[in-house]
Amino acid sequence: MQDRLFVSMEHPRALPETDLIKGAIVGAGAVGMAIAYSMLIQNTFDELVLVDIDRRKVEGEVMDLVHGIPFVEPSVVRAGTLADCRGVDVVVITAGARQREGETRLSLVQRNVEIFRGLIGEIMEHCPNAILLVVSNPVDVMTYVAMKLAGLPPSRVIGSGTVLDTARFRYLLAERLRVDPRSLHAYIIGEHGDSEVPVWSRANVAGAFLSEIEPAVGTPDDPAKMFEVFEHVKNAAYEIIERKGATSWAIGLATTQIVRAITRNQNRVLPVSVLMSGLHGIEEVCLAYPAVLNRQGIDRLVKFSLSPGEEEQLQRSARVMRQTLDGIQF
C-alpha cells in the first residue's frame, strides 16, 4: 500500500534527537517577525536566533519579543549573526527584496537571486546540518536556487509552497459551506502564484467529494459559483498588499506549522515546494506538492490523483517555472 501511495525521497540524515530544538530566522522584516512571534507563542524552538542586515532593527524586534516571554512557555530569543547559528536544526529564510504593489512574484526573482548568492554560502558555512526552509518570494524558484547553491539533497531544502494558499482555500470554502476549515480537505498545488492549481477533484468534507455532488464545481458552469472562492485565493496577496503594504500574519502561522511538522517529527502532509522528479511527468523544477514532513525534512511525496484538466494546469505551472529558471543567472 505505501509503495502505491508515496514516492520516497533520499534523506542521508535526519535531525538529531536532542533535548533542545534550535532555529534561526534570516530576515527580520514583516514576514520574519510574524514567523518569530508565531513560533514564540507556539513554543516551536527552545532557542531562536534572528538575523538581519539591519542589526539595530533586529535588536529592537528581539527586545520587544522577549518582554512577552513571561506570558508564554520559556525560550531563548536573541539577535545574532549567522555565525551565532551553529547547531540550529532549521534555518527559515525570509530575506529578499520586498514585493511591490502590483508586482508579480516572478518579477522579484533576479533581485532575490542576487541576495541568495552570498547568503546561502554563508548559511552552509555555519549551519551545514540544518534543514533550509525558504519563504522568500517567488518561493518555488528561490527554493530551487537555494537547493542548487547549497548543494543539499532535495529532502533538506523546502519551500513554504502553497501551505498558505491551501489554508486560504480551505477557509473560504469552509465559510461557504458553513463548516470548520479543519473539517474540509482541499489543496492548491503548483506555483505559489498566478499559475497555482486548485484541486477541485479531491476537495471533500468528511469524505464527501464536492466534485461528486456537483461535477461542475470550480468551473463557470457551477451553479454555486465556487470558482469565485479560488479567484479570491489567487488575488488575496495582491489585495492585502494594496491595503496594508505586505502580507505577514498568515504566512507566519503557516511557516510555523511547517517547522513544527519537521522538528516534532509529525509525519504531517503539507503542500510545500519540493523538487519534482518525475511525478506527473515533471522534472527539475520546484513546485508545491503534498509531502510528508518529519525530522528527515521531506520524507515522502503523496501520489496525488488529478483530473485531466488539473494535470494540464500543473504541467503549465511547471512550464512557467522552467521558463523563469531558464531566464535567470545563479
UniProtKB/Swiss-Prot annotation:
InterPro entries, per the entry: L-lactate/malate_DH (IPR001557), L-lactate_DH (IPR011304), L-lactate_DH_AS (IPR018177), Lactate/malate_DH_C (IPR022383), Lactate/malate_DH_N (IPR001236), Lactate_DH/Glyco_Ohase_4_C (IPR015955), NAD(P)-bd_dom_sf (IPR036291)
Catalytic activity: (S)-lactate + NAD(+) = pyruvate + NADH + H(+)
Any one GO BP annotation for this protein: lactate metabolic process
SUPFAM superfamilies per the UniProt record, alphabetical: LDH C-terminal domain-like (SSF56327), NAD(P)-binding Rossmann-fold domains (SSF51735)
Phosphotyrosine: residues carrying this PTM: 238
Role played: Catalyzes the conversion of lactate to pyruvate.
PANTHER family from the UniProt entry: L-2-HYDROXYCARBOXYLATE DEHYDROGENASE (NAD(P)(+)), L-LACTATE DEHYDROGENASE
Pathway annotation: Fermentation; pyruvate fermentation to lactate; (S)-lactate from pyruvate: step 1/1
Sites where the protein binds beta-D-fructose 1,6-bisphosphate: 170, 185
Pfam families from the UniProt entry: Ldh_1_C, Ldh_1_N
Protein name, entry field: L-lactate dehydrogenase
Known partners and oligomeric status: Homotetramer.
